[in-house]
């Protein structure tokens, strides 16, 4: 027993050593059956991850190394406390501490690996990116690097795919991406600022290769590319004779200057002033002008900014200047050169000329000083007086204007202004002098200014003349419908005018146009001119016979209505031969001349006198009322000439008949209906005449084709065969087309007659020789239509025998004609009469 006691401890120790390790752990340490787990992100795990074996007397807790708030221990089980997110934490760790009585016995670690899931969309670092691209950027160069266009995806394992979509049509031809996974922007073709100054793209990124893959996320951004123009083109002198936007064939300028004069203004060149602009309009650098060759003696100066070419010194003799003008950009990068040809021409020094001899203006009554006189033809526009140099248009700017004989008005440039308040209505005449400060030439013209009660109305109803006034308000009306029977070549203008109008104060010299007629000058269209009485015994002479009255050319007639002259006055009408030129007009001009009270004498121009009259555009009618008080009113005599003021508008009587208006639409429609009916009747009459004269021919053409006419030797001088009375053969001298053919030695058979040839008269055949010498010859020849022709010559036919040629076909003897042709030699020559075979195709002599 003692030996067993000695062996017991070693056996017990050996048994303890050979026991399984797990049995010892279960008895003394904490344990788990699995310490590594895999969980997809965004998965809510509610089941316990692992069960913890805790020995009796021990407790388990989470250590400090555990992922905060990720786990919890409930009982002896480990739970996942959060929804895992791969982008936030891809690996979760739980530290398990087993303690017994505050003493750490076992330490365990459990790991949770979070699996990545494609749950995030890619994002661009920008919404819109705007890039400036130089126009001269080389092709295949990278415009925007990859790093500036990459998108970011929180799913770190995702591969992004990029697509460039155009928003500007055709923009994809210029730019593209380097590859589908590399979003660098590359230039594919040269840029053109003028064709496409800017382009817009839509950049799209996707985190899957295809659109149908689930899940798939996309993102977009906008790219704006602004093309910056490059300095590629030099300045262009305009206008280009040819330009396609890239190349300009520059203009060359031409001008002329008078010798011995210095022009006060820049030269007027053709095709326009010197002007250049930057060929790169996007850059549009300012242009600096200079003359670097051809400026002999410094004759010309060019403005460096505007390019205006002026004369610095006069040219003594005619010559030609060839100036080379350079236009250079302000940044001195590029320049261009053109040629300016200036010819110095000897000037005759002609005075300036006015395009009109009479200008008409209007201004409201009561207008103060400094009011602009309006144009009577266009009341909304100021009246402009412009003279022109007949030789050099460059000298027009050197012309100054002034009013020489009136203190109520003044010139300011080309515009007429009032100098005082116009309190009285009427017509004023002022003379304007144009003075060329270079050539010292002068010219004058006349302005007729109507002072009316109010601004010229735009309606066509003229206001009634004011009571007691000598001149009613002047109005201008325009009608588009011509009023028959007065001829009109344009819109009819009616203006009311009156007498002489108010007189200027003392010291003012009025110089109206030379006219013995105080009434307003006729206008451009239908016009009426009232000539008031001449009180106080004054004498108004009208043209006498034989006088010549120069009047501007007009279209229409001149009618003069001259009432009786009471109080013993005489009224003389124009005598034959009187030439009374009227103002050029396209309508009718009527001149009313009131009576001449106070015993005055109103004489019409005598023969040979000249009375200028205002130009009209149509017919002029002059109404001359009675001249009371014993005055004498003489009408123009033949040959007189009455010059009157030139005008283009027609003053009409204010208070004329209201029926002198345009026709209404109903009137024109009625006139059109009448004209249409007349046209229809004319067409019907024409149809009847055509049917009467050409009806048989039309029936013949529409019916059976006519029988072919025989073509023989017809003598039109003889009567047809159906006539009973035979006429002798006419003499060759009476034949309209005599054809004398010499008689051959022996008669030859006649050839085929041409369709259009005229047969020889038989008289000419007899003149060739004696009929007794003629032998009988029978000839036949094939005609084109298949018939035969037979000719017989008689030997014993006397000279007194009549020769008759028959070739008059008839419709009822065709058979006889055929039989006559077949019976060729049986007495047809002498015994057969002309009636044997009428209408046959044979000629019997």
From Swiss-Prot:
Compositionally biased intervals (Low complexity): 506-518, 633-652, 835-845
GO terms assigned for molecular function: beta-catenin binding; calcium ion binding; cell adhesion molecule binding
PTM remark: N- and O-glycosylated.
Keyword set, alphabetical order: Calcium, Cell membrane, Cell projection, Differentiation, Glycoprotein, Membrane, Phosphoprotein, Repeat, Signal, Transmembrane, Transmembrane helix
Assembly and interaction partners: Part of the IMAC/intermicrovillar adhesion complex/intermicrovillar tip-link complex composed of ANKS4B, MYO7B, USH1C, CDHR2 and CDHR5. Interacts (via cytoplasmic domain) with USH1C and MYO7B; required for proper localization of CDHR5 to microvilli tips and its function in brush border differentiation.
Gene that produces this protein: CDHR5
Ranges of biased composition (kind: Polar residues): 539-549, 556-594, 602-611
Residues carrying Phosphothreonine: 810
Name recorded for this polypeptide: Cadherin-related family member 5
UniProt biased composition (Pro residues): 729-762
Main location group: membrane
Function: Intermicrovillar adhesion molecule that forms, via its extracellular domain, calcium-dependent heterophilic complexes with CDHR2 on adjacent microvilli. Thereby, controls the packing of microvilli at the apical membrane of epithelial cells. Through its cytoplasmic domain, interacts with microvillus cytoplasmic proteins to form the intermicrovillar adhesion complex/IMAC. This complex plays a central role in microvilli and epithelial brush border differentiation.
Entry's transmembrane regions: 670-690
Natural source organism: Homo sapiens
